[in-house]
Amino acid sequence: MAILTVSNGQSIQDAINAAAPGDTIDVQAGTYTDQFLTIRASITLQAVGGEVLLRETISPPDGKAMVTEGASGISVAINGFDISGVAVPDGNGAAIRYEGGSLTLSDDYFHDNQEGLLGAADPGGSISIDHSEFASNGDGSGSTHNIYVGAIAGFTLTNSYIHDAVVGHEVKSRAANNTITGNRIFDNGGSASYSIDLPNGGNATISGNTIEQGPNTQNPFIVAYGEEGASNAGTSFTITGNTIVNDDASGRFLLDPATQPTLSGNSVWGLPATGDTVLLASRPSLDTSSLSFISNPGGDPPPAPPPVSEPPPAPPPPEPPPLPPPEPPPLPPPPEPPPVPPPVQHGHMGH
């Protein structure tokens, strides 16, 4: 697998055309104008050294998007791109148009387009979005959205900031399996319809999000499930651990004609209690000025991890116990006693 590099002013599409499946294309920071990209092979496209801004001054030649991606069976990753201003005559100009395979988006910022992400159907396909921002997308007609996902196998949205769609939905997915976790989904300044719309049902988990429905919403329901007919096979639907704020006088939490969801551990403000919910006594502060949970919105390279600290030195070995004192030298043997003199012999004296 090779790494190809595109410098500011060079053609990104030329690098895509030259890449083999599995290659990575490093795009240097800068503004790339009217570079409309088509990706039909398994590659990774990533920003290096700062933000990569894709801007248009003319309508996309294919009438679709700034980036058109997809073919059945391919895997594409796009990391660190900022795309805005895409418009086409039919009103569906998207930052990125998905047409099949597996698509992974991370650290991207798609804003002020007619569509943020527009996804076609692929029964075996998947889309995963992490640490990204979708803002103020939509053409005002009501049929465009911040995120639209067609009939695919799986859709995952995590740790992202989705807000202020222009009339359409913040997130709409027809995927058979949906996981929407750890996001901020707000409509404080826009006129969106549903915050989350899963029109064909399926298996879905909505957990750990902060969701706000603004006062100018076009639809009172915050979450909708199966409203267009539960054509997807699964019916497991869980909503847990979310903070949900309603600023609309007629707002409602859930439109769900298709199944009985599992509701647990949600905190709500401006809504009646539904299931296992906690009513908040006051409106929570929903400050979005510091989105620290998005590691690098718009493509800034993530900070390097802190250096691994050196392990502390091993303690010195314990001192050995003192040696016992040496044995004293043996005492010299006592002196031999002097020899006993032999007895004196006396002669026999006669008379």
What is the role of each PLM region?
Residues 270-280:
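Active-site and glycan-interaction determinants of carbohydrate-active enzymes
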